[in-house]
Amino acid sequence: MARVCVMMMAMAIAMAMNIAMGDPIAPCYFIFGDSLVDSGNNNRLTSLARANYFPYGIDFQYGPTGRFSNGKTTVDVITELLGFDDYITPYSEARGEDILRGVNYASAAAGIREETGRQLGARITFAGQVANHVNTVSQVVNILGDENEAANYLSKCIYSIGLGSNDYLNNYFMPVYYSTGSQYSPDAYANDLINRYTEQLRIMYNNGARKFALVGIGAIGCSPNELAQNSRDGVTCDERINSANRIFNSKLVSLVDHFNQNTPGAKFTYINAYGIFQDMVANPSRYGFRVTNAGCCGVGRNNGQITCLPGQAPCLNRDEYVFWDAFHPGEAANVVIGSRSFQRESASDAHPYDIQQLARL
């Protein structure tokens, strides 16, 4: 647990420094993503992908909010480190001048492709999230009273995008519902995702976004759900899935480099969630983890065959589990990922900037 304590202390110091300076180091934080960072947008949707029930939020100060975690998500951690005095409001609840702090558009089960996650019901796709942001931008213009003023304000904000996981988990590797796995090679599928991703980034850029943090896909083949289904020993990750994830991530890095070279006035960076996650799994004791292959709350093999059910009693030693449920990291892991995204521990954590550096550019 020593490593976790050191990281928590460093996080507390960074937060104290930002608070001491007064305002957050970025005026606003816009979040696009899926269940890893959804903070309640799916609560009002007709969807199986919802987490607004106990024991989700068991360790969160506001209880079950729709976050797919026992506590904070990675973006909650980053929000604190940026110096905000409260978490970013989900789009479904954002009203008035609150949007000047930023908005969380993330939606559980969402993907880059429109059809991704449809078997789970309603969700807000990447394109839908960007469309919601365009609506937010028009509101920012109305509040600030001038397009130039709004453009200047928005250019200083952080735009975090973390999508693609469901395009593999709830599309490419789900042949019962989707044909993409037989239509595309892993390389061709990643190209298709990157092309669609690029379209949305251009829309965001045309609506004032200038500081982008593109979060790579984690090692989905190591999740309790995949281990329960596809691992003979319940420990060995599914390399078929992880290999496809690495192909996408490699192309995302190339996209960051391309945009940095060809997009006037904008800065892009890549957050290596895959590498940070792999470090936690390979060196669990460094972070105080004892269980890397099972959910703290779930049903069946690896607590991963069915995800955490309403009212189910979770494990008591939650900080010792990398995973909270069948798919999602717990707060302890999110603190590690969020902290290293904000201030990289090694050069490989972020390319070419960490989020703190991006905010100060």
Curated annotation (Swiss-Prot):
GO terms for molecular function: hydrolase activity, acting on ester bonds. The active site is at S35, D325, H328. Disulfide bonds: none annotated. Its main location: secreted. One of its GO terms (cellular component) is extracellular region. InterPro entries: GDSL, GDSL_esterase/lipase, SGNH_hydro_sf, SGNH_plant_lipase-like. Its EC number is 3.1.1.-. One of its GO terms (biological process) is lipid catabolic process. Belongs to the 'GDSL' lipolytic enzyme family. This is GDSL esterase/lipase At4g18970. It comes from Arabidopsis thaliana.
